[in-house]
Amino acid sequence: MKALLKKIFQNKKISSDKDLKFLDLKNNKGVNKIFGAINNYNETSEIRYVGGCVRKILNDEKTDDIDLATNLTPDQVKQCLDKNQIKFFETGIEHGTITAVIDDQNFEITTLRKDVKTDGRHAVVEYTTNWKEDSLRRDFSINSIYSDLDGNLYDPNSGHKDLNVGIIKFIGDPETRIKEDYLRIIRYLRFYTEYSKIDHEINIIKIIKKNIEGLGKISKERQFNELKKILKLDNFLKLFNNKTSCELFSLIFPQLKNFKKLSKLSKPQEKILKNKSLNFVISFLVIDETDNSDYFAVSYTHLTLPTKWTV
């Protein structure tokens, strides 16, 4: 009984921001089934939305993936799902992640973790029941916001505030976080492009440049996946209108040497570009003057552009 009361009042203490933006998710059959299964496991069991799922809801974006965190171990999660006849896969069991499937929708459920050691690519983790510890291993404050089913936030790193004012803030020491996983260099550029409302911090840029060669430890597949996420942003052209962002982009992806042309596109041309396929955008970035990129742009789109991209 004592543990149950602690669970109830702990939630009230750490979360005072009920947000109606979570109402649509609350009405999701799968969400309710999973929250019920985990929360009813024992007196101390908890599950919350986390990461990009919360960030997007708070920013009025469409939520594609539902990421969940729990203080139960993976084995306990599997017991909960089995008991409630919920299908699941051990997709990331080595990282503490179980993927539940309800009505063809995936729900990633990950046990709270803390880092033990890392080599700049992958971290060795151990499970914890401490939400604060789990938050401290995440990359940016805007990705360390948790929410219960009703939209009550647990925000130990002030990520909601940073999201509102447009600050991309590393959790803890930026250089330490980058060295834990060098892919965070590209992730920084992506989140800065998508959410930032202020200029880059000089110190952050210095640290990124100092550690840029660490990306050599990251597989090309992981790097390319981040590039695709950047180019799929609704406002990805914002990146090419910022001098510092352009400099970082050229250091990270030197092959995409034609990116400077994107900063000179007219509004109609920008609109056309955003409607093109990802392959087209990447091809346009790769082809340089010797390959006649203007001709390629028109030819590839079967003359749907009103004029050649003479920029």
What kind of feature is each model-predicted range?
Residues M1-L303, K308-V311:
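Catalytic cores of the polymerase beta-like nucleotidyltransferase superfamily
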